[in-house]
Amino acid sequence: AKTKDTREKVKEAREIRELCRKNGVIFIVNDNVDIALLVDADGVHIGQEDMHPDDVRKLIGDNKIIGLSTHSEKQGMEAYKNPNVDYIGVGPIFPTTTKDTTPVGLGYLEYAVKNLDLPFVAIGGIKAHNIDAIIAKGAQRVCLVSEIVGADSISDMARNLQEKFNK
C-alpha cells in the first residue's frame, strides 16, 4: 500500500474503515496522519522518522490512538514517558522482509514486558513457527504481515495463530 497514490490509499482506507466499523474492529492507519484524519480512523501508527507524537496529537486530538514504533530500550522508555503515545510497536523481533531494520531480538521484548507499563505490539519476522517464543516472553499482542497475507488461506492462518494465544 505504500507505493499506491494518495487517492487510491484514501479510497481503500475508507472501505477498510467501514468494514472495521461494521465488525467492531479498531482501525489504525500506518504512517499517514492526513489519511487517518480524512477517513476518521481510530488512530495512527507512526515510526521514529515520522512526525513527532506530540505534533500528531495536536492534529488528531485527544480521542484518537497514537502508536509509535520502537527499536530499543531507550526509544521504548521515551515512548513510555510521553503521554501522547498510547501504545508502542516493539521490534523487529526477527529478520523481516517488510522492513530494512536490524532485528532487536527477544531481549527488547523481554525488557518491554518487564519495564514498560504501556500496551505494545510485538512485530517483525513473527511466523507461526516462532510465535510461541514471543508468547512465552509475555507478549499479548502481535503483528504479522507476510505470514498472513502470504498464506494459502488467510482465515485458516489467522485461526491457527489465535489458537496459539488461547492455549
Label for each model-derived stretch:
Residues 1, 48, 68, 122-123, ...:
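Small/polar loops that bind or transfer phosphate-bearing groups
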Residues 1-9, 92-99:
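Glycine-rich, proline-tolerant flexible connector loops at the mouths of alpha/beta enzymes
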Residues 10-28, 56-71, 101-128, 161-167:
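Alpha-helix-loop-beta-strand connector modules within alpha/beta enzyme cores
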Residues 39-41, 46, 65-114:
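Glycine/Thr-rich beta-alpha phosphate-binding loop at enzyme active sites
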Residues 48-58, 89-100, 128-164:
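Glycine-rich phosphate-binding active-site loops on the catalytic face of alpha/beta enzymes
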